[in-house]
């Protein structure tokens, strides 16, 4: 690989569209600022719902071609964000989307008929080694991935967290697998987050506008569940500023998964940009370098 810019950001996500929903503005910002942004997507998203009726035949229970279609959607989204370095973990189709069910309590859970080639069933060391190779090649100063709950409990998000965390540790070990490249210790690691204050504010605006279906059942004054992060744990906020349009265009590129009348665009159209404009992060490795407001506004702060 040719010599890379001084600032290098690596993001590890489970399926196509996760990167845009969680970090689209962040990715667009750092590309625009000249940083090298690398996205690793762990599956093709083969088990996703198809929200476009004329493409319903692509679904896993029909022609099972959704994953291949989503490769194109992801490429289009990356074009919108300006990201040129995108890889699938182990190569396209190496790990299959596990799918997800909801248990009796309404929590995300692993399907009972999980396929042996699913990401959930992947050998952790094998999958981590695939990522170690990328880490040692790109040498990122910052890694972004999910928390231990995978943000909302999807098995592939949980597995992506495990793989990214293990790979970061292995990549730093000088004596581990020299054939995968020279050791590299990532200085800062962040988990994506949704701010409690931002979520409550956006929900309140939706309800006041008469929208009671977007995120149905979520009360702006009630409990929000583990996918929402208390503000005291938020370390970095990346404002959307001039990048929200790029993020929204990238979301539209994931056409089989995100509809313009769905919850993400509802939040945006009803001035709910606190969630999907500003992007929130928890620092789990490295030293924070907050500003006067007690927060970082640059993932590379202090480096």
Curated annotation (Swiss-Prot):
Record field: catalytic activity: 1D-myo-inositol 2-acetamido-2-deoxy-alpha-D-glucopyranoside + H2O = 1D-myo-inositol 2-amino-2-deoxy-alpha-D-glucopyranoside + acetate
Which InterPro entries does its entry note?
GlcNAc_PI_deacetylase-related, LmbE-like_dom_sf, Mycothiol_biosynthesis_MshB
- Official protein name in the record: 1D-myo-inositol 2-acetamido-2-deoxy-alpha-D-glucopyranoside deacetylase
Q: Which cofactor does it need?
A: Zn(2+)
What is the recorded function of this protein according to its Swiss-Prot or TrEMBL entry? Catalyzes the deacetylation of 1D-myo-inositol 2-acetamido-2-deoxy-alpha-D-glucopyranoside (GlcNAc-Ins) in the mycothiol biosynthesis pathway.
Name the enzyme's class: hydrolase
Q: Which family does it belong to?
A: Belongs to the MshB deacetylase family.
Q: Which residues bind Zn(2+)?
A: 15, 18, 157
Instruction: Offer one Pfam family short name for this entry.
Output: PIG-L
Q: Which domain of life is it from?
A: Bacteria
Instruction: Return the Gene3D superfamilies for the record.
Output: LmbE-like (3.40.50.10320)
Q: Which UniProt keywords apply?
A: Hydrolase, Metal-binding, Zinc
One GO MF annotation is: zinc ion binding
Which Gene Ontology biological process is one annotated for this entry? mycothiol biosynthetic process
Q: How is the cofactor bound?
A: Binds 1 zinc ion per subunit.
Is Metal-binding among the key words of this record? yes
Q: Which HAMAP family match?
A: MshB
Annotated source species:
Kribbella flavida (strain DSM 17836 / JCM 10339 / NBRC 14399)
Q: Which gene encodes it?
A: mshB
According to the UniProt entry, what is the EC number of this protein? 3.5.1.103
